[in-house]
Amino acid sequence: MRFYIATGLSNAEMAKTLAGVLTRNGHEFTYNWTEHGDIRSEGEDRMTEVAFSEVRAVRDAEMFIALLPGGCGTHTEIGIAIASRSNKRVILWSETGDEFTKPDRCCAFYFHPAVERICCPFEELISKLDADRIDTSLS
């Protein structure tokens, strides 16, 4: 299964950990943005290149996972995932659930019918998404 993980730069290590579990189990990361990290100071051409790569990767993924909280890019990617969702799972994860319950932290798109919201410790998310269970319900 092809997957994409979106999150803020501050959560890049969690994205790497989750991607490692999924790739070790035979799944394909459509674009590993954690390899280049923050590119905002690298100029307009580089940012354009990364933007195209990330849009294509989100669109091509069969499963999209957003680790919340995320930044502007994460929320843009959530929108792309919802808009291109044919045969795609769109999973939003929050350790505390605050992003889904606190008005100053939530977003209307978190409640789109195509979205699966998951609240649990990160280690539990990893277990839920482990290869043998990747296609089963996470509810």
Residue ranges of predicted features:
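Conserved catalytic or regulatory cores that recognize and/or transform ribose-phosphate-containing ligands
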Residues: M1-S139
